A protein has these predicted regions:
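Catalytic cores of nucleotide-sugar-dependent glycosyltransferases that transfer UDP/GDP/TDP-activated
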Residues: 1-172
């Protein structure tokens, strides 16, 4: 099967627990395709009158694309998007890229960006130290958080359970 020029390769990772270095590009492509699918699959009869359900950071661009690209262009004007979080530890944090890289206008940038004192972005291939202690060098680093952007643009934000909602909302 051929998937966007990737013949015979695994689209989301080489093996369980390991990310591709370009996952943000892959998932941006996935999110654009997810939005365009209902209108393209005319035999289903949905057109643009749909509710999208985005799950975790991997699909967090869906509500962003919907609000920043599609609706301003007069497309999917009735569509809604619910954003569901399954594990808040995985937020899709990356070093910033130009918004155009993901097919988004520059005006979307503020929804993604945050600053912290860590010189790294931690993920499965670059985990934080076990003791949770990192050295601060006194600098501030700008980063992007896809889950944050998804939450800011979703029509409804959900968690997998009422208890999980309470757990992630607590300061403990």
């Amino acid at each position: 099967a051929k998937v966007w020029g990737k013949t015979g390769s695994k689209l989301y990772g080489e093996k369980s627990g390991h990310d591709f270095a370009d996952n943000q590009d892959r998932f941006a492509m996935f999110c654009h395709a997810a939005i365009k699918a209902p209108a393209a699959l005319t035999e289903l009869g949905f057109g643009e009158d749909v509710v999208f359900v985005a799950n975790d950071w991997h699909s967090a661009l869906v509500p962003v694309i919907l609000n920043k690209v599609m609706k301003p262009a007069g497309q999917f004007t009735k569509a809604k998007c619910a954003m569901t979080i399954h594990n808040i530890a995985f937020q899709g944090r990356f070093f910033p890229q130009p918004m155009a890289t993901y097919g988004l206008p520059d005006s979307a940038a503020d929804d993604f960006f945050f600053e912290d004192g860590y010189s790294k972005v931690y993920d499965e291939t670059n985990p934080a130290k076990e003791d949770g202690k990192e050295e601060f060098d006194g600098k501030i680093y700008r980063k992007a958080n896809w889950l944050k952007a998804g939450f800011m643009n979703a029509d409804k934000n959900l968690t997998v359970s009422e208890n999980y909602a309470k757990e992630i909302a607590s300061s403990k």
